[in-house]
Amino acid sequence: MKVVEISHPMVKHKLGLMRAASISTQEFRRLTKEITSLLTYEVTAGFELEKTEILGWQGENIEIDQIKGKKLTVVPILRAGLGMMDGVFEHVPAAKVSMVGMYRDEKTAKPVAYFAKLCDKLDERVALIVDPMLATGGSMIATVSLLKKAGSKDIKIITLVSAPEGIDTLAKAHPDVELYTASIDSHLNDKKYIIPGLGDAGDKIFGTK
């Protein structure tokens, strides 16, 4: 599995601010959007270009570069992933949205999809999953599996922070996906929280506890 930890100073600086215990909902939400925007820029750097002809401002046909082939659908994992969508839209405003919601089954401890609203022609699109945290990897693996079952063949993932344990688990289950993250953190604690992590990103984005 391709894993890219973004080392850009602006990404690291903004992520550092997000780790503060005193951060406000407004600030956390703003930084989530800004970092997601920077990560989306990195993800799309590998997209191919092709030449196309348009009518230029001077009234003559001119040749321009345009992104080739597949269009994009952004896939937020509910609910925290919703806070990352605007960062993607800054670069790909026409992206369609496919939403996935997961809950953990108390008996099996496995993630179960309680909601899935996917766009059409997934096999012709790049699916960009967004979720602030990759902890154990369970929800992410289930989301990737759901997308593949629906026809998706090109899947990329953006997270703000990722645990090594979650990366390893995801790589074993889906070695063909790509992960772009602002930070590979130290480890998971005994409660499966990422350390040093960000705390509960969903609560901090939506101002709940």
From Swiss-Prot:
<dbReference type="GO" id="GO:0006223">
    <property type="term" value="P:uracil salvage"/>
</dbReference>
<protein>
    <recommendedName>
        <fullName>Uracil phosphoribosyltransferase</fullName>
        <ecNumber>2.4.2.9</ecNumber>
    </recommendedName>
</protein>
<dbReference type="GO" id="GO:0000287">
    <property type="term" value="F:magnesium ion binding"/>
</dbReference>
<comment type="similarity">
    <text>Belongs to the UPRTase family.</text>
</comment>
<dbReference type="GO" id="GO:0005525">
    <property type="term" value="F:GTP binding"/>
</dbReference>
<feature type="binding site">
    <location>
        <position position="79"/>
    </location>
    <ligand>
        <name>5-phospho-alpha-D-ribose 1-diphosphate</name>
    </ligand>
</feature>
<feature type="binding site">
    <location>
        <position position="194"/>
    </location>
    <ligand>
        <name>uracil</name>
    </ligand>
</feature>
<keyword id="KW-0342">GTP-binding</keyword>
<dbReference type="InterPro" id="IPR029057">
    <property type="entry name" value="PRTase-like"/>
</dbReference>
<keyword id="KW-0460">Magnesium</keyword>
<feature type="binding site">
    <location>
        <position position="200"/>
    </location>
    <ligand>
        <name>5-phospho-alpha-D-ribose 1-diphosphate</name>
    </ligand>
</feature>
<keyword id="KW-0021">Allosteric enzyme</keyword>
<dbReference type="InterPro" id="IPR005765">
    <property type="entry name" value="Ura_phspho_trans"/>
</dbReference>
<keyword id="KW-0547">Nucleotide-binding</keyword>
<feature type="binding site">
    <location>
        <begin position="199"/>
        <end position="201"/>
    </location>
    <ligand>
        <name>uracil</name>
    </ligand>
</feature>
<dbReference type="Pfam" id="PF14681">
    <property type="entry name" value="UPRTase"/>
</dbReference>
<comment type="function">
    <text>Catalyzes the conversion of uracil and 5-phospho-alpha-D-ribose 1-diphosphate (PRPP) to UMP and diphosphate.</text>
</comment>
<dbReference type="GO" id="GO:0004845">
    <property type="term" value="F:uracil phosphoribosyltransferase activity"/>
</dbReference>
<feature type="binding site">
    <location>
        <position position="104"/>
    </location>
    <ligand>
        <name>5-phospho-alpha-D-ribose 1-diphosphate</name>
    </ligand>
</feature>
<dbReference type="InterPro" id="IPR050054">
    <property type="entry name" value="UPRTase/APRTase"/>
</dbReference>
<dbReference type="InterPro" id="IPR000836">
    <property type="entry name" value="PRibTrfase_dom"/>
</dbReference>
<comment type="pathway">
    <text>Pyrimidine metabolism; UMP biosynthesis via salvage pathway; UMP from uracil: step 1/1.</text>
</comment>
<dbReference type="InterPro" id="IPR034332">
    <property type="entry name" value="Upp_B"/>
</dbReference>
<keyword id="KW-0328">Glycosyltransferase</keyword>
<keyword id="KW-0808">Transferase</keyword>
<feature type="binding site">
    <location>
        <begin position="131"/>
        <end position="139"/>
    </location>
    <ligand>
        <name>5-phospho-alpha-D-ribose 1-diphosphate</name>
    </ligand>
</feature>
<dbReference type="GO" id="GO:0044206">
    <property type="term" value="P:UMP salvage"/>
</dbReference>
